[in-house]
UniProtKB/Swiss-Prot annotation:
InterPro entries: Urease_beta-like (IPR002019), Urease_betasu_sf (IPR036461), Urease_subunit (IPR050069). This is Urease subunit beta. It comes from the Bacteria. Its EC number is 3.5.1.5. Pathway: Nitrogen metabolism; urea degradation; CO(2) and NH(3) from urea (urease route): step 1/1. Belongs to the urease beta subunit family.
Length: 101
């Protein structure tokens, strides 16, 4: 093995298997682009994004870690959300939860 070398298993990595998902239509009603990262609590995103927030409670974007989705002004886009794992305790973001879901 060479220092820094990766030894990866064959095949595709399956992420979020068995977790609840939901697809939502999201519209950016603002006049600026809005970008949301992979692990941001979607329920607490910028309020210029219009969607069913109750369905997004406890959910994040179902995209690879470190990725993001960008919403241009006036753009409508369907996104898939996946439930947070672990103990389902969420702090920070817009401080709308700050505790257990």
């Amino acid at each position: 093995m060479i220092p820094g070398e990766y030894q990866l298993a064959d095949g595709d990595v399956q992420a979020n298997v068995g977790r609840k998902t939901v697809k939502l239509e999201v519209v950016n009603s603002g006049d600026r682009p809005i970008q949301v990262g992979s692990h941001y609590h979607f329920f607490e995103t910028n309020h210029a994004l219009k969607f069913d927030r109750l369905q997004a409670r406890g959910m994040r974007l179902n995209v690879p870690s470190g990725n993001a989705v960008r919403f241009e002004p006036g753009e409508a886009k369907e996104v898939e959300l996946v439930e947070f794992g672990g103990n389902k305790v969420i702090y920070g973001f817009h401080n709308e939860i700050d505790g257990k879901l």
